[in-house]
């Protein structure tokens, strides 16, 4: 699995249209609030041209991309943290995701109602962020009450956790984001179990009309806000994505060329998600399968091996490694070996994006 991204936004911003396009799940995308009731989940293959290039050389029995999971959360409204709209249940669903994709409406269309009666991306973002902060505030206050008793009895872990929660409490009281608080590695690890919503990496998916990727004041405003937060912005046109999703691969290429677009918005969303979560891809390439795997940037070879199977990490001996560019240039493993580009790496090796790897292990 690549990662799980919860798609949030106000009702009628294009959330479900985008989700349908990304996953071809075909859930209802009606023009009225709350048409998403249970969270819909879709697993999407990660588009990566490198995988096809490797497969052309190796000619395997099958090709397996890595994947990304999208969860379409019902449209949030002001008061969701207090049970308004469809309430707390949906905030709980977001907690289970690794990142948040916040869909923001950056287009005008009189036929599609806006829940607030006007198009104002800054206001929309504030509404959602406030609800997420209020939900975190509730969790934080309850955790503080629980921890105070343990901290008084001398529990060191409880004292440490309490000190972190007391640091983030005033930020949440002002509807701020926990991710704006400077927390070190140990502090982040200590509060990981709370799954705080405002700590999750966030990207803004700006839903625009097909002719308003440029010179769009709504999009400019989202970019301005995202820059202040250190968040990523991905402009897409959900309506175009919905059309692309219905086409065969060859038709897609022609359709994109006609529109002057290089690739579907899905690719941009996934790449942004990868950057957001500090992820990268490595490959395994054999006659049975050529496959992409997702690991964290900075992962060691044994950690990369564990993605395939935990036994690979436990019994790790060495990793055979060829850089992707070398594998392509020298037409596979044998050519790379002859060119001196095949190498053996130990347990401290830091995996690089695109590495073609084979693990030696003994259990």
Curated annotation (Swiss-Prot):
Occurrences of domain TGS (ranges): 278-361
Record-linked InterPro entries: ATPase_YchF/OLA1, Beta-grasp_dom_sf, G_OBG, GTP-bd, P-loop_NTPase, TGS, TGS-like, TGS-like_dom_sf
Domain OBG-type G: 3-256
A family per Pfam: YchF-GTPase_C
Disulfide bonds listed in the record: none
One GO CC annotation: cytoplasm
Domain of life: Bacteria
UniProt keyword list: ATP-binding, Magnesium, Metal-binding, Nucleotide-binding
Gene Ontology MF term list: ATP binding; ATP hydrolysis activity; GTP binding; metal ion binding; ribosomal large subunit binding
Entry cofactors: Mg(2+)
Binding site for Mg(2+): 16, 36
Binding site for ATP: 12-17
Family: Belongs to the TRAFAC class OBG-HflX-like GTPase superfamily. OBG GTPase family. YchF/OLA1 subfamily.
Protein task: ATPase that binds to both the 70S ribosome and the 50S ribosomal subunit in a nucleotide-independent manner.
Protein name: Ribosome-binding ATPase YchF
Native source organism of the sequence: Haemophilus ducreyi (strain 35000HP / ATCC 700724)
Lineage: Bacteria, Pseudomonadati, Pseudomonadota, Gammaproteobacteria, Pasteurellales
